[in-house]
Amino acid sequence: VFEDGIKRLARVSDRERHVLNLVEELPDNAELPLHVTVASGFPKGDKLEWVAQKTTELGAAAIWAFPADWSVAKWDGKKLAKKAEKLEKIVLGAAKQSKRNRVPEVRLFEKKIDFLDCLSQFDRVIVAYEESAKEGESAALVKAVTELKKGSRILFVFGPEGGLSPAEIATLEEMGAILAGLGPRILRTETAPLYALSAVSVLTELLQ
């Protein structure tokens, strides 16, 4: 795993001083064509740790979390710092195991407004909305992903247990987010991000 996302072949020239000589850059690329960030409302227990590990394996570029209206978990600054440190270790291990070129960014927001202020940096924001799934909506996700060019930045927003509140949905829509169902079944807060990333992989890698 390298900071710039490029894998390289090197030869050890000095073991004591840990000096390497670059032999060549390798074309191997294990990253998704889209820069995908997953953002979850603070879930209960250790669900975020599980989400961080599995979404890293599936190609997420960043794992974010924020205090949603219906989040049961309440984390202050000190708890957030400790949680972030734990998550960073988890994603590093998962990135190595899955032979990623990059280690995903971990960012936990203490205030929801700070999270919302970051939405403008994305080319597309998709909100996983269970009401869309109940209504049988199935095209929004496919359309939103396939319209994007390679390298585009996409943000998926997921609610905690109980989902996002009507006020949050309204705010996200006002900010230009797209509401999308994730298939005909209602998914748990820790399962939905995996579905979304798998869909991105199928649409941008396997079907190309």
Q: Where does each model-flagged region fall?
A:
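Short conserved beta-strand and strand-loop elements enriched in small hydrophobics
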Residues: 1-4
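Short beta-strand-centered aromatic/proline hotspots
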Residues: 7-15
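RNA substrate-binding interface of SAM-dependent RNA methyltransferases
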Residues: 14, 23-127
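Short, acidic/turn-prone active-site loops that include or flank metal/cofactor-
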Residues: 26, 132-133, 184-187
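Gly/Ser/Thr-rich beta-alpha loop segments that engage phosphate groups in nucleotides
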Residues: 43, 47, 161-165, 185
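Generic structural signal for helix capping and beta-alpha/helix-loop junctions
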Residues: 72-73, 135, 189, 196
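Active-site/ligand-binding-proximal alpha/beta "capping" segment
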Residues: 125-163, 167-169, 177-181
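Structured adenosyl-cofactor binding patch, chiefly the S-adenosyl-L-methionine
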Residues: 165-208
